[in-house]
Amino acid sequence: MDKNELVQKAKLAEQAERYDDMAACMKRVTEEGGELSNEERNLLSVAYKNVVGARRSSWRVVSSIEQKTEGAEKKQEMSREYREKIEAELREICNDVLNLLDKFLIANATQPESKVFYLKMKGDYYRYLAEVAAGNAKTEIVGQSQKAYQDAFDISKTEMQPTHPIRLGLALNFSVFYYEILNCPDKACALAKAAFDEAIAELDTLSEESYKDSTLIMQLLRDNLTLWTSDTQGDEAEQGEGGEN
């Protein structure tokens, strides 16, 4: 199957909501080498986001059940084994994506926009690994996530408008990283607020084609700020991810 056919099959799989098939197609497209078009890049991102998202959601449910079965040994053991099975799947998916990023995507990116997109993606998938990691392994993974986000952030500040949806999406996820993974609510709020304020100040630079994406992410930044600065704590903070492209 040539590249065009793989892309068409990925689009078909997306419509059928068969995201594992979609990811497999886009993985093959990526492994052919060369720089991905914006459309191909977005197809790859959507495919893996859905594939990993299903496991992250399952992991949260099973972890919660496991905690509630304390005292019921058999049930707890079954929950633990199932959680570990989901974790193994999640790790495999994340490592797949990180391998594609390091081997092909980041190296082949010629435009600042693409570089930021892929470095953000690298930060995201290390963050997903960090959610299920523990001990020394977690420290290492968290460091990798932070470095990728910071590298992307530095490029975005000099090369992209504050209203660019990729720059805004990066700020959104980097702030979620500070809140959820590093437990630094002050840093998370400062980052989200700065991104929101900088975008508001330059609303006139908002291009027509990215208007919808940018304003959606700005809304998510504001929602997270409201959530984080209130007394409500908890997993709802993760809603910030809804606005990724």
From Swiss-Prot:
Record-given protein name: 14-3-3 protein zeta
Alphabetic keyword roster: Cytoplasm
GO cellular component labels: cytoplasm
Record site feature (Interaction with phosphoserine on interacting protein), residues: 56, 127
Annotated tissue distribution: Present in all adult tissues examined with the highest levels in the brain.
GO MF annotations, alphabetized: phosphoserine residue binding; protein sequestering activity
Naturally occurring in which organism (per UniProt): Xenopus laevis
Gene: ywhaz
Assembly description: Homodimer.
Subcellular location: Cytoplasm
CDD domains for the chain: 14-3-3_beta_zeta
